[in-house]
Amino acid sequence: MAENSDITSLEDSFRKFAIYGDTKATGQEMTGKNWSKLCKDCKVNDGKAVTGTDVDIVFSKVKAKSARVITYEEFTKALEELSAKRFKGKSKEEAYEAICKLVAGKEPVSAGITKAAATGAVDRLTDTSKYTGSHKERFDQTGKGKGKSGRETIVENTGYVGSYKLAGTYDAKVKK
């Protein structure tokens, strides 16, 4: 059979694939979807000797009659069944060890995950250094928003017009 380190890494792979895509999964049981993903990602399913249909049939054989998931023990039985089909020229033990090496230590591959793409228009519209007019007043030099002071003009009841620079200097001129 497989070595002890292979068994632990095989069990580790089982747990990683068992919880893949399911937030409530404990890693003790694997669904048919995740079993198919494991076979595809670990190259057990080569499309010639072992097809997706074979993988599904083996899953149906090893699981309990009314169950929808397989345990680790059923998982090892499924690998034994597939190993004979995948590695036809080898003995049962050699084929099982070969298929264990394919699966051991592997993790689910997330292919086709989309990332947020910043296009030219988005960059142009969200860059605060390029703002003009009254919108420019809403941000400081670093691009951080000023909050309420940037959105609203705060009224100071001093008696002077807002842009008058010499506010408060009249008394100094009159006293002389």
UniProtKB/Swiss-Prot annotation:
Residues 134-151 have a biased composition (Basic and acidic residues). Its main location: cytoplasm. Pfam families: p25-alpha. GO terms for biological process: microtubule bundle formation; microtubule polymerization; positive regulation of protein polymerization. Keywords: Cytoplasm, Cytoskeleton, Microtubule. GO terms for cellular component: cytoplasm; microtubule. InterPro entries: EF-hand-dom_pair, TPP/p25. It is found in: Cytoplasm; Cytoplasm, Cytoskeleton. Residues 132-151 are annotated as: Disordered. It comes from the Eukaryota. GO terms for molecular function: tubulin binding. Gene3D superfamilies: EF-hand. PANTHER family: P25 ALPHA-RELATED (PTHR12932), TUBULIN POLYMERIZATION-PROMOTING PROTEIN FAMILY MEMBER 3 (PTHR12932:SF16). Belongs to the TPPP family. Regulator of microtubule dynamic that has microtubule bundling activity. This is Tubulin polymerization-promoting protein family member 3. It comes from Xenopus laevis.
